[in-house]
Amino acid sequence: GQALPGGAFADIDAAIGRPAAGAGSDGPDRLAAALQEGRSVTVLVSVDLLRSPEARATLQQLNNLLHVLRLLGKGPAMQFLFDRANQMGAWDMGGLPAALPGLRPVADDAARATLARNWGAEIPSEPGAGLDAMLELCVGGRMGALYIVGTDPLVAYPDRDFATRALGAADLLIVQDAFLTDTAGMAEVVLPAAGYGEESGTFTNNEGRIQNVRKFREPVFEARGNLAIVDFVAALRNQALRPSTQAEIFDEIARLVPAYQGLTQDGLGADGAFTKAVPTLPAGMLPAPPPVPTAADRLMLITGDCLFHNGYLSERSDILNTVANDPYVAMSAQDTAELGLSDGDQVIVRSGQGELTAQLKVDRRFPKGLVFVPENYRALRLNSLLRRGEYPCAVEVQKAHATPEVDRPGRIWRGV
């Protein structure tokens, strides 16, 4: 075994921000005691952490905590509670600008050499551009062509005004999507892609379980499978991509991505199969925006999904919209009482960027000082209230004097 450092328990206190001895029993004290007594520990990381300016620093603290717990023999694990389907799979495939497939840093010489041998191409050692950097390049007139696949930055990016200006400044905007999204409406070229059930593949959920997605119908009208579209675009550049079939790509993943090694698509079965545990995500793979000062006396707007309903797919379903079809604003009972608001009131949420109107929900479990508006209702244009790099966002809330007409999801274009 490995000798346990004498200060390991003190390290736990430091990692969780425990106050000095004698400060009294509170949340951090109880957490430290539970971590010391528990046989195993799983840390669940919410998506709000990844959105915050403190994401990198907090993730580094969590990495330190997991290291101490590992020395204590706790067998710790960390799981991100992603709010997008297959986000874990996208990260595993190298979807982060500073990561290679398998969540290995781009500076890893051995990992780059392995990929270079298999792909017959040089792998850059410097991180690529994330979405923030890409949009900045657009605004600066340095983006010749921007190719967007399966996402809608005009709705998802936390600053609609900036995203609109940036996308409009690109010399050429190409969108590949199954739906005519707001972003596709700005594009010079739209490549209609297959939707769910129109092509085969796999996805990896939050717990690392990889499952099959099977094709059960052909793409409608002129739409093509995403692989076929990528092959078509490559051919326009006189390039041939290999492998180019879904089965061949899975075999390559199982060969080159450590967490997937040894898996076969036939062996996934009806319930899927777990990928192998990988080292904790290095904090350096996340962006480090400057901290945003917050005023203690201001209401702060946060956002997220309502249930498992982020709107990109689910808002296009009449059936799913019967479960959560009305946008709302959630606040604490204390804040609403101070503002003279009641449950069910139509309220205006206003920031320095814009405003929206929705029905108020008073939640007695909600902490004072926070306002929550789910992001999955496209008609609200919630991101019109947000400014890039500023999250949470300071807002004011007041009662609306008239009930506005808010588009219901049933009147939103659903694509093909």
Task: Name the predicted role of every residue range.
Residues 1-33, 58-186, 192-207, 216, ...:
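Extended redox/cofactor-interaction regions of prokaryotic respiratory oxidoreductases
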Residues 191-192, 375:
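Catalytic alpha/beta core of large soluble enzyme barrels
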Residues 137, 144, 211, 350-354:
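Short strand-coil-strand connectors
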Residues 42, 72-81, 241-248:
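Flexible, glycine/charged-enriched surface loops at secondary-structure junctions
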Residues 44-46, 209-218:
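Flexible glycine/proline-enriched surface loops and loop-helix/loop-strand junctions
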Residues 42-52, 62, 149:
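Short glycine-rich or small-residue beta-strand-to-loop segments that form or flank ligand, phosphate
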Residues 24-26, 214-272, 314-330, 334-416:
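Long, contiguous, secondary-structure-rich segments that constitute the structural scaffold
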